[in-house]
Amino acid sequence: MKLPPKITRLPIVWELRKLTLYKLSVIKTVFKYKRFSIIRDSFVYFPIWWKLQQRKNEPLKNDRPWITFSAEEFLRKILRKDMVVFEYGAGSSTLYFSRRVAQVFSIEHDKKWFDHLQHEFAKQQITNVVCRLIEPEAIDENSENNYSSDSPSYKHKTFESYVKSIDAFPDKYFDVVVVDGRARASCITHAKSKVKPNGYLMIDNADRKSYFKGNDFLFDETEWRVFDFVGAVPYQFDFAQTSFYCYTPNR
């Protein structure tokens, strides 16, 4: 039976719905990955997940990147004040990094979001972030496009300039490179050589196989150690995977 709209808007109904969706995500993720540690972690991170689901929460105010909770714990342990970070995709993670490392370079494709972030940087007096707006460019529908986005919103658009922005930096320059924006498969290809020895390439939503299209061969197991973190994510019901590729050429 479908409940009347007034009933579904009641706070208790909304809270029960959130709890149900969280449980379903736990079950679905356990079956997908066959990892029972996901059940343990779902209890550990449930209180903070629940708190961040409150309607008045603003992601830019919470000092928490939009990655799995277990990945954020790992990230907090590896970051140092002398590090330099590059990000494809600016947002709450940019603010998070700015408080923990020396310098952050971020690339954003959406002008409205970019303008909002610029206001937030000024408001919070953040001075160690260089954030650039690089919007996608229109191309002919028959043109070959190796820098496309999976999103239908960007059909017949190329993110070539966006992806290649990291090429302006020397190889092995960054301690951490974050791939959490558009055209991720291409971003991974260009970002790999920019990671320092013992540095990290962080890929959010790494469970989406399309992001690794053509990139599987890039990560030689003798040079890259992989750390996968599967579980709950702030502000959303679906669980996800965040992966860190640590560049260890001399091990």
Task: Describe these PLM feature segments.
Residues 69-141:
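SAM cofactor-binding core of SAM-dependent methyltransferases
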Residues 38-45, 50-52, 100-103, 120-133, ...:
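P-loop/Walker A phosphate-binding loop and immediately adjacent motor/lid segment at beta-alpha junctions
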Residues 166-171, 176, 181-251:
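C-terminal substrate-binding/active-site "lid" region of AdoMet-derived donor-dependent transferases
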Residues 61-66, 82-85, 152-157, 177-180:
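Short, flexible loop segments at the rims of nucleotide/cofactor-binding pockets, characterized by
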